[in-house]
Amino acid sequence: MKSIFYYIVNFVYPSFEKSIIRILKNEKKLVIFDIGCYRGVFSKTILKLLSKKKYKFYLFDINKNVKKYIANLLKLKNIYYNEVAISNKNGKANYNHNLFFEFAGSSLSSLVKNDIKWVTSRKLISKILFLNNEEFIKYPVSTITIDKFLEKNKIKLVDVMKVDIDGSEYEFLQGAKKTIENDKVKIILLEIMGNKNSFYDKYKKIVNFFKKRKYTLIKKKKQWSVSLFSNLMAVDCLFVSNKYLKSQSFRNLHYNRVNS
């Protein structure tokens, strides 16, 4: 029942997979990162759209149940799962695991956990649908920066990096600064989440971070399900490297810059 509810909710979430594949249509080999993969919906959707392209997928999550959820996906060739948190340091951090509404709010950040309206409303939904009275639990997990992960695994270029980490966006960017500045990622799909009263400050800071590093925001969509009955707001943003925008493979695509 929980998994069915997750897929129903996910169906109404913003979808960027077709846009991403259209951008990369001339690429024959792809390296894709799915950070905060949970049940692997993003990776599975991309796989269906890839046709005959060669690929390598690197999936990341720190929910101990995820490996079970994506067991069939991991049977495929060139799919690599990493039970580690992407952050701004290499070491350990505390993970807030949402047991009552597992597919949302679990993060190194306490942003969602601390939003009383979000927690109360989702607990009510969970209790009605699943008879679930669980809470958040906290436990230590391993962390690594994107810069270190690429260096350690000798990855020179990433075609797509999807990031869904429920409030830890600053930490991700701090740990990926070298990678982004050196133009090692063509496309970044980043969920930006924050409190409604300070969201646009965070949003503008992140958009400006990418602008300074020569990335263009070409598409964005608000996640209405996050804002409903909460003090939170979330927007999915699709950034593309300016270098790749100017390349031959992107020349005939008609995307406009999004006003920040």
PLM region descriptions:
Residues 1-260:
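Phosphate/nucleotide-binding beta-alpha loop and adjacent structural elements of enzyme active sites
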